[in-house]
Amino acid sequence: MKLNISYPANGTQKSIDIDDEHKLRVFYEKRMGQEVEGDSVGDEFKGYIFKITGGNDKQGFPMKQGVMHPTRVRLLLSKGHSCYRPRRTGERKRKSVRGCIVAQDLSVLALSIVKQGDNEIEGLTDTTVPKRLGPKRANHIRKFFGLTKEDDVRDFVVRREVTKGDKTYTKAPKIQRLVTPQTLQRKRALKAKKVKNAQQQRDAAAEYAQLLAKRLHERKEERAEIKKKRAESLKN
């Protein structure tokens, strides 16, 4: 079985092939999300605590959280479910997935290091992979650099160098939820437009009601005139 071990603190990942069934026995009958001590896996993992995050069987079917079964099952999946990406709006499909219980017929088991042990693991805990992109949302940038609301966030955006041919230039992400005088002015203009439209609708409704009352009054007078003429003709 292959173990895909990740260390989120450093952003590193490493694959290890283990053929000895006795070393893997500690993972059997465990569920996704459970923590397992790594002492029995090998001496280099002494003191480590792993968290089971997923896996695939020999045919490539992924493990699905919440399915309490050690084998494959067929589930009707829709948008929002893991292990399925709908191609059309509202599409559902019955797909084969593995349960969340670890069994012997898995080919890959994904683990995450929760607690580091005594020894360093080469290529996993002794190196650090820097994040490629910085925060994008305005509040996240403020939190990242410890800024106040008075500071201009645009000066602190993490830029990255891009080389295209002979040219080297920097790129910065578009800051999301950035509050500027221009956005506030747009918000005020939109609010004023809504108020103006509502007032126009009220004026139009009042004008229509006035016109309708006038037409009803004219029709009432016409009917009264017709009745009066009819009564006079009957008398004569």
Swiss-Prot record:
Pfam families: Ribosomal_S6e (PF01092). Keywords: Cytoplasm, Ribonucleoprotein, Ribosomal protein. GO terms for biological process: translation. Gene3D superfamilies: 1.20.5.2650. InterPro entries: Ribosomal_eS6, Ribosomal_eS6-like, Ribosomal_eS6_CS. One of its GO terms (molecular function) is structural constituent of ribosome. Component of the small ribosomal subunit. Mature ribosomes consist of a small (40S) and a large (60S) subunit. The 40S subunit contains about 32 different proteins and 1 molecule of RNA (18S). The 60S subunit contains 45 different proteins and 3 molecules of RNA (25S, 5.8S and 5S). Belongs to the eukaryotic ribosomal protein eS6 family. Component of the ribosome, a large ribonucleoprotein complex responsible for the synthesis of proteins in the cell. The small ribosomal subunit (SSU) binds messenger RNAs (mRNAs) and translates the encoded message by selecting cognate aminoacyl-transfer RNA (tRNA) molecules. The large subunit (LSU) contains the ribosomal catalytic site termed the peptidyl transferase center (PTC), which catalyzes the formation of peptide bonds, thereby polymerizing the amino acids delivered by tRNAs into a polypeptide chain. This is Small ribosomal subunit protein eS6.
